[in-house]
Regions:
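Active-site-adjacent "subsite" loops/lids of carbohydrate-active enzymes
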Residues: 45, 49-65, 125, 129, ...
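Aromatic-lined carbohydrate-binding/catalytic grooves of carbohydrate-active enzymes
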Residues: 77-114
Length: 178
């Protein structure tokens, strides 16, 4: 056992004296290469009408004007990307065969905007006109929000698959569960 300790000690002493590949940093002498491209993004949050639309149930033309105004501002501030929240609480701010329309858009979950339009398609087209990338921002886990004003739509996951929901539903308007 003592022999092993001596060998390890000898190895450590020898290894400590070997020249290492030294790269001494001298402040101010080496600049890292600039990134090939900067990502300057702004978020447009739609849950609880944080950023857009300013309130639920606005006329479609007003919704469009507000969205275009946000995209104009992002371009003016030299952003090159927008992250647009399109799925807030297992609902959609785009035409979806699987999930209901968002209450933050129309005021009632599951209600189609009138006249019908696709906010995501509009956002993509208008962002590209301004030289902005548009990234669709999905929240994959949240199924409800405490500020919900309307009951879950009939095709909402809370109603179609309540067994997979792990939240307290007593305070959700019209959820039918406690």
């Amino acid at each position: 056992m003592q022999r092993i300790h001596l060998l390890l000690l000898a190895f450590a002493l020898v290894a400590g004296r070997l020249p290492a590949a030294e790269a001494t940093y001298v402040p101010g002498t080496v600049m890292p290469p600039p990134p090939a491209r900067e990502f300057r993004g702004a978020w447009i949050a739609t849950v609880a009408n944080i950023d857009w639309p300013s309130k639920p149930g606005l006329p479609v033309e007003r919704q469009k004007q507000e969205l275009i105004s946000l995209l104009d501002r992002a371009a003016q501030l030299h952003f090159n990307a927008v992250l647009f929240q399109v799925r807030t609480v297992a609902d959609a701010l785009y035409a979806s065969p699987l999930e209901p329309w968002s209450e933050y858009l129309t005021g009632i979950q599951g209600k189609t905007p009138e006249p019908a339009y696709d906010p995501l398609a509009l956002a993509v087209a208008e962002a590209h006109k301004r030289g902005l990338e548009l990234h669709a921002w999905f929240n994959p886990f949240r199924a409800a929000h405490p500020e919900a004003k309307s009951p879950p739509a009939l095709n909402h996951v809370i109603r179609t698959h309540p067994e997979i929901i792990r939240i307290r539903l007593a305070n959700l308007a019209g959820s039918g569960r406690a």
